[in-house]
Amino acid sequence: MNLNTKYHGSIEYEEKDVIYFQKGIPGFEELKKFIIFPVEDNEVFLVFHSIENKDIGIIVTSPFNIEKDYEIQLEEEQITNLKIQDEKDALVLNTVTLDSDIDKITVNLRAPIIINIKEKIGEQIIINSDKYKVKHPLFKEEA
């Protein structure tokens, strides 16, 4: 199949690449089907893109690129909804807010996207803790 995206051109994907979000994601609850593909010439960022709306693509990254000790505790309901039986089956991604000023690029560590890579289902959750910020700087100033 082919997805003609607004910013990333034409992307080839297969049905097995589609990840289903029963609740959609906050702000885009009506969109349920997404694919993930790499940003060209970049090993850190991925594109989390709706296949139902060619204009909706979100830059994401692994939280472990930002915080080596990043950890979250899923609630039983979330584990059940995502059918996670082993933590190796869970992919964790976080949304990135881009800015032309590199020092203003942030990552939302408070609301990770959790994907069961075996079952191809996902959910964006909100962590009820002040441990992580919604606007965590991607690049920290060196002391």
From Swiss-Prot:
Localisation per UniProt entry: Cytoplasm
Keywords annotated in UniProt: Bacterial flagellum biogenesis, Chaperone, Cytoplasm, Translation regulation
A GO cellular component annotated for this chain's UniProt record is:
cytoplasm
Give the chief site where it resides.
Answer: cytoplasm
Per its UniProt record, what InterPro entries does this chain match? Flagellar_assembly_factor_FliW, Flagellar_assmbl_FliW_dom_sf
| Coiled-coil regions listed | none
GO BP term (any one) = bacterial-type flagellum assembly
| Keyword Cytoplasm found | yes
Query: What single Pfam family name could you report for this chain, choosing any that match?
Result: FliW
The Swiss-Prot or TrEMBL record describes its family as follows: Belongs to the FliW family.
Q: Which PANTHER family match?
A: FLAGELLAR ASSEMBLY FACTOR FLIW (PTHR39190:SF1)
- UniProt xrefs under NCBIfam families: PRK13285.1-1 (NF009793)
* Subunit annotation: Interacts with translational regulator CsrA and flagellin(s).
| Function of the protein | Acts as an anti-CsrA protein, binds CsrA and prevents it from repressing translation of its target genes, one of which is flagellin. Binds to flagellin and participates in the assembly of the flagellum.
**Stated name of the protein:** Flagellar assembly factor FliW
Species source reads: Clostridium botulinum (strain Loch Maree / Type A3)
- Report the gene name: fliW
